[in-house]
């Protein structure tokens, strides 16, 4: 019965030390569309919100599947949209990046670079990039991991 959800930054500290502004996700996309200006109809943000709502549905009530975001503590500030893991054991096991369109080379390099950096930092061996309609599998050099690029509609149809 929440209208807006707040997504905290991943931290292994008992006391949250992040000064980052948490991400906010509105459950009712129709309301967001109605009250936002025409130039703020960002498809990427709307896709990210839809993915968040599906993750909330899949993980509700489970301690071992906490959803957070993650920003690398480096000068590049590489970000992953969703990090899923065990809250008490501080063990991340899933990384999800959301991108509406990976057709632009700069966007593709940014999304893959961020996901690869966080995968190495968190010791997660696979990552997921959800798009509007693109799909492929990307093997990292030296068998360090795999990216799966999936259309978000197909991912939403998979069982949790």
Could you say what each language-model-derived stretch is?
Residues 97-103, 108-111:
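Terminal-proximal interaction/regulatory segments of ATP-powered molecular machines
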Residues 132-160:
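Domain-level recognition of nuclease-like catalytic cores that cleave nucleotide substrates
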């Amino acid at each position: 019965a929440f209208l807006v959800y707040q997504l905290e930054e991943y931290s292994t500290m008992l006391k949250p030390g992040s000064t980052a502004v948490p991400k906010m996700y509105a459950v009712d996309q129709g309301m967001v569309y109605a009250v936002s200006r025409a130039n703020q109809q960002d498809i990427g943000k709307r896709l990210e919100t839809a993915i968040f709502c599906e993750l909330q549905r899949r993980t509700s009530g489970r301690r071992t599947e906490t959803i957070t975001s993650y920003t690398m503590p480096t000068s590049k500030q590489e970000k992953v949209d969703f990090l899923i893991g065990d809250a008490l054991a501080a063990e991340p096991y899933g990384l999800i990046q959301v991108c509406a369109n990976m057709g632009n080379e700069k966007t593709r390099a940014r999304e893959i670079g961020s996901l690869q950096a966080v995968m190495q930092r968190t010791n997660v061996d696979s990552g997921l990039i959800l798009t509007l309609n693109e799909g492929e599998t990307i093997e990292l050099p030296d068998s360090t991991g795999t990216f799966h690029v999936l259309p978000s509609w197909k991912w939403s149809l998979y069982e949790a």
